[in-house]
Amino acid sequence: MKVMKILHIGQMIGGLDIYIRNSIVYNKVAENEYVIACGEEDKHQPVIKNGTEVQEIPIALYRSLNPFKDLKALIQTVKAIRREKPDVIHCHSAKGGIIGRTAGWITGVKTFYTPHAFSYLCTPSKLKRWVFMTIERLTRFETYVLACSESEQEMAIKEVGYSKEHALVWHNAVPDSSLERGKMVDKSEPYACYIGRPCYQKNPLFLLDVIKKVKDRGCNLKFILLGVGYHSPELDAMKAKMHEFGLEDSIRLEPWINHADCQEFVRKSLFYISTALYEGLPLAIIEAMANGKAIIASDVVGNKDCVRNGENGYLLHLDADAYADKIIQLVNDKELRTSMEKKSRALFLEEFFIENRIKYLQNQYNMVYNLRYGGANLVLLKTNIDNVILVSVGYDTTLHHEERRVAA
């Protein structure tokens, strides 16, 4: 098999940086070559693969809609594709997805799109949701959506209109973060941990309602909220509500810190909390599971793909009293907490440990590569939900049950 060149398109920020970086660094296929087209103002460390820095192409890729910058990014990306001649494009999130899918369509290169939570979920405005949904549908082209969870895959088919043949799935997966060591954390007072920018998606104002309920019931648990920094549109509203509720002594806000220090906070916590309105598949929860933490999370897309209700944590509707009930229960019941911690760790190793999961991402790349070049025989594997997956002969065809839910 000749070298397969894979072009990633997306901002190297936060969870996208982790996803792109891990999918390159932990892929052991020697024949792969990688290029990253990322935002010209992204602040990140270079990706090192086998001792060599992966080539990056800066483009005008920004979060907000800007017709002039977006057109510039598209032109830059098309030029990069024609110059680099990738075999496969893998584009990420809303803006990278629009640019990448359109550029792939223009140049005729097979394209994967991982939404990391569809863009139309990001706003309560019905008009904006309709606009974002329309953009998602208009830029489907012949793209393969590569969802990061089954619930995101289902959404791609039922709401965005992807065919089952073009709706694939590969779970977000991460290294074993329990092995990382950061700065020492003061754990003299027990605390619960939460990671996320103060923004609409992460629902921080509801979290404050929960914390107030917990405090009003006489529970002195502290809360450490990590990731307060880059692009935090609800931070001022959050601080105002903390003051209104008198929660300054109950909450510690931590700015954007390095990954090892962040994981140290998670490791020393009693358990992990998420109040998100939606997710793709949350890396923060997966890393909390790697650290053997019980999870209390909202019952939404993404969260429900990694939390088994009543086993490694709880999935809850957005009801502050229900959250307070489970928080206080886990604070007081060490035996239950320990049981859930063990289950979280086991689920991580089984379903989300990247060294066990990366081969399934490569299988997806191989499938599309071989459809493009026709250079290998393809095997049709029936799945347990009457879908089909194509896998090239000569590669690992023993698919985990989660990957057997996809259609290709």
Predicted regions and their residues:
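N-terminal strand-loop element at the rim of the active site
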Residues: H8-K69, E234
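Nucleotide-activated donor-binding/catalytic signature segment of Leloir-type glycosyltransferases, i.e.
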Residues: D236-I257
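Short hydrophobic beta-strand element within catalytic cores of glycosyltransferases
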Residues: A294-A297
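Conserved acidic donor-binding segment of nucleotide-sugar-dependent glycosyltransferases
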Residues: N309-G310, Y314-A320, Q329-K334
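Donor nucleotide-sugar binding/catalytic pocket of nucleotide-sugar-dependent glycosyltransferases
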Residues: I57-P58, R137-E180, Y194
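Conserved donor-binding/catalytic core segment of Leloir-type glycosyltransferases
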Residues: L7, V185-I211
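Glycosyltransferase donor-sugar binding loop
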Residues: A37-K43, I195, K222-A237, P255
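Aromatic "clamp/platform" in nucleotide-sugar-dependent glycosyltransferases that forms part
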Residues: L277
